[in-house]
Amino acid sequence: MVKEPNGVTRTMRRIRRIHFVGIGGAGMCGIAEVLLNLGYEVSGSDLKASAVTERLEKFGAQIFIGHQAENADGADVLVVSSAINRANPEVASALERRIPVVPRAEMLAELMRYRHGIAVAGTHGKTTTTSLIASVFAAGGLDPTFVIGGRLNAAGTNAQLGASRYLVAEADESDASFLHLQPMVAVVTNIDADHMATYGGDFNKLKKTFVEFLHNLPFYGLAVMCVDDPVVREILPQIARPTVTYGLSEDADVRAINIRQEGMRTWFTVLRPEREPLDVSVNMPGLHNVLNSLATIVIATDEGISDEAIVQGLSGFQGVGRRFQVYGELQVEGGSVMLVDDYGHHPREVAAVIKAIRGGWPERRLVMVYQPHRYTRTRDLYEDFVQVLGEANVLLLMEVYPAGEEPIPGADSRQLCHSIRQRGQLDPIYFERDADLAPLVKPLLRAGDILLCQGAGDVGGLAPQLIKNPLFAGKGGKGA
């Protein structure tokens, strides 16, 4: 029997078994977990087992390793990510048998349809902002359902079924699938030139798609928009929905002043219309996280959450996996090095993290291990990468994570090393994806350094390995 939270209409009443093709993906596993908790039968396939598939299996999902037509036998609907095409044997078999095959975002839209949906869109900051909203709502006693692209450290998962009518989720523009969503509240954090293949290389088309997404709101909904971003500011006059703006700009409806950062913690004062100034702090570094917090405060205030709960939810926020996640200290001669892991894979995200490190730890050197993600992104944003990566004190560049793409001449890590070296300020070190990083990086480290491992590919496995490596006599720490 499918269970629904109080006040939520039961959905998909003709559907019993739901099969996910690519169930281990960040965008897929959260939806699968919520559906399992609602009482649906869930199965799924992926190319390899992982901690994610093992977790879903413990919750009752049937997991298949590898893609075969028979995996989907008995399914009433297939859910696919944008990485799965019609030639996939499970998809081909379902289409032949006239079983519905729906994109991930359409299934998310079904979960959101009869709930008070809060969708967070934007090129950068979606995961952290969605996580902050879920945390503040929980602090306010609203117990939301959430589906997030990263693991919320406090919950130990990236998805959870709540008892209230609220559902908080990321809205993915990478394949324009966020157009399936019809939320009550939508956030746009920023709009940048990324995933341009989806939009035929046309930035105007990307902007128009964000406008279309915001007009999926009902006429009584709410658009929450960051006016510090020039593109968001540009599209603002086109939005015919109730709107609240936020940012550091003086004309923002909700803005932050008196910003101060010490290490991981950032303090600031929030100014809101017809409200007393609110002093808050968040256990995350950087101005970008002040903006993520402001979006959260706008929505929490609009939903009637008390200032006390807002302050508590932000102050106690334990972060998200791979978003400036502090693993602990690596022991080196004369002291230790702080080890940080981060998912940032766009020059703007890299710049935000470097700025946060310089702001919170101004006396420390930054030793950076970076892996570009996709050859197309490296090609399209090449000069931006050269500029921002050159701001590290020491740089090691791992070969590009292809994400299924074929190599593009001149858009790889060797060429990036060459271009950065030509600027004359830094001598980057190139290494292959299967190289052992520990003996390579240890001679480069000094006591007091910050070692940042950053990128969206398999670079994400390096920090967990380094903290356990006997070369560093590592002392583990909690994620930030």
From Swiss-Prot:
Q: Which SUPFAM superfamilies match?
A: MurCD N-terminal domain (SSF51984), MurD-like peptide ligases, catalytic domain (SSF53623), MurD-like peptide ligases, peptide-binding domain (SSF53244)
Q: What pathway annotation does it carry?
A: Cell wall biogenesis; peptidoglycan biosynthesis
Principal place where this protein is found?
Answer: cytoplasm
Q: Which residues form a coiled coil?
A: none
Residues that coordinate or bind ATP: G122, T123, H124, G125, K126, T127, T128
One Pfam assignment: Mur_ligase_M
Q: Which UniProt keywords apply?
A: ATP-binding, Cell cycle, Cell division, Cell shape, Cell wall biogenesis/degradation, Cytoplasm, Ligase, Nucleotide-binding, Peptidoglycan synthesis
Molecular function via GO: ATP binding; UDP-N-acetylmuramate-L-alanine ligase activity
Q: Identify the InterPro entries for this entry.
A: Mur-like_cat_sf (IPR036565), Mur_ligase_C (IPR004101), Mur_ligase_C_dom_sf (IPR036615), Mur_ligase_cen (IPR013221), Mur_ligase_N (IPR000713), MurCDEF_pg_biosynth (IPR050061), UDP-N-AcMur_Ala_ligase_MurC (IPR005758)
The processes (GO biological process) annotated in the record are: cell division; cell wall organization; peptidoglycan biosynthetic process; regulation of cell shape
Q: What reactions does this protein catalyze?
A: UDP-N-acetyl-alpha-D-muramate + L-alanine + ATP = UDP-N-acetyl-alpha-D-muramoyl-L-alanine + ADP + phosphate + H(+)
Gene Ontology cellular-component annotations: cytoplasm
Q: What is its EC number?
A: 6.3.2.8
Cellular compartment(s): Cytoplasm
User: Which Gene3D superfamilies does the UniProt entry name for this protein?
Assistant: Mur ligase, C-terminal domain, Mur-like, catalytic domain, NAD(P)-binding Rossmann-like Domain
What general EC class does the enzyme of this chain belong to?
A: ligase
Q: Which family does it belong to?
A: Belongs to the MurCDEF family.
Protein function: Cell wall formation.
Q: What protein name is recorded for this chain? A: UDP-N-acetylmuramate--L-alanine ligase
Source organism per entry reads Pseudomonas aeruginosa (strain ATCC 15692 / DSM 22644 / CIP 104116 / JCM 14847 / LMG 12228 / 1C / PRS 101 / PAO1)
